[in-house]
Amino acid sequence: MDIRNLKYVKQFISHNLINFKKKTYKNSNKILVEVYDYKPSTIPISYLSNILAQKYQANIVGYYSNFPSMKKKFKTLLEIFNPYDIKKIYKSFGVEKFIIPKKSKHTAVEVLFTKIFKKINTKEDVLDIKFDGIVFGDLIYDEFLRSSNRMTINITSKQFQYFLKDAISLYLFWKNIFKLENFKSVIISHHVYFMGFVSRIAIFKNIPVYSIGITNIQYLTKLNQSKHCAFKSYSEVFKKFDISLQKKLLIDAEKKLTNRFSGEKDIKLLMDRHTDRDFYNKNISTKKILSKNRFKVLISAHQFSDAVHVYGYKFLFDDFYEWIDFLGKCIEKTDYDWYIKFHPSEHEKNYKHINYFSKKYPKFKILPND
C-alpha cells in the first residue's frame, strides 16, 4: 500500500467502526463476501454486506476465492505487522471470520479428473466442462491463460492437466463449504477466472449473488451470470424513458464518445489499468507507417490472457489466439496490407505473443505501441 494512502484507510476504518456497529446473530445465517484487495471497492462492499446482514439477520463471513500461493502466504504473514491490511478493513465493517480454500483429498480429485479428462478432445471441450451440472469450463480456460500468460491451451500438456486437477480441487472445496454453511447471499468482485466458482455454485443453489464494483452493482441469476448482463436490456430500458430524457442522454453519450476518441481523459480511462503509455500528449508524429495505394485491413487485437470469455464462450473461436491465427491464414489469400495493433494493456507481458505472430505470419505489419 502506498504510504500516502494510509491516512485514508485509517479514516475509512474509523468510519466503519462508528457506522457499522458489530452485531452477532445467534443463528446459522451468513453473508459470504469476497476479500478483494482493491481499496475503493471495499467502500460499496462494506455498505452492501451490512444491508444484507440486517435483511437476513446474518453474520458476515469473508472468503478468498483461490488457494493461497507462496507469495500470498508470505504477504499474509507480513500483514500481521500492518495495522491497516485488508483483513483489518473487512473486520472494521463486521466480518467475523475468513474462509481460505484448502486442497481437497487427492483420491476425490483423481476420480473426478479421470471422468472429466477422458471427455476432453478439443479446446472447445474444455469450455464445456461441467461439475454437477454447473458450467465451469470458461472459468477454468481463462484462469489457465491468465495464470500462465498463455495465448491458448494445449490440452495434452502436463501443465494443463495439473492445473485442471487444481480446478477440480477448488470446486470440491467450495462444494463442501456450501453444504456445511447457510449462506443467505453472496457478494463477489468479478464473475470470471476462479473468482467465478463461488458465484456459479451460489446461483445454482438459488442464493442471491451480487457483483460489486466502485461504480455499480449487478444482481446475477441463472439467466444472467455475467456482471455485463445489463447491456442486453439497455435498448428496452431506454425505450421506457420519455422522449426529452432520451434526447438528453443521446447528446451526453455523443459528447462522451467524442471525448474518448479525441483522447480526453474520462472516468472509464481513469479507472482502467495502467498501459505504460501516455495517450494524452499533443505531439503529432510525421512518421510514415501506412503504405499507399493498397487496400488496408486493421486488426485491433485483444489482450490474449485477459478474461477471454468474459462475455460468454459460444463464439466462432475458442480464444483470441485462434482468431488471430485464422486471420493470419487469410493473409495468404489476399493482396491487402494487413496491420495489427496489439492491445496496449500489459503490452510487455504480451510481447512474446506479438513476436510469435510476426514470425509465423511475416506479412502482418505490426504497428508500434505508441
How does the language model describe each region?
Residues M1-K30, I51, K55-I168, I214-R277:
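Conserved N-terminal ligand/cofactor-binding loop architecture of enzyme catalytic domains
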Residues E34-Y38, Y63-F67, I188-V192, A301-Q303, ...:
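Structural motif
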Residues V35-I45, D306-G312:
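A short, glycine/small-residue-rich beta-strand->loop->alpha-helix junction that serves as a flexible
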Residues K39-G62, F317-I331:
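Histidine-anchored nucleotide/phosphate-binding helix
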Residues N59-I60, I207-Y210, N216, W338, ...:
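Hydrophobic beta-strand scaffold residues
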Residues L170-N224:
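Conserved nucleotide-sugar donor-interacting segment of glycosyltransferase catalytic cores
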Residues N369-D370:
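Conserved active-site histidine-acidic residue motif and adjacent donor-binding/catalytic loop
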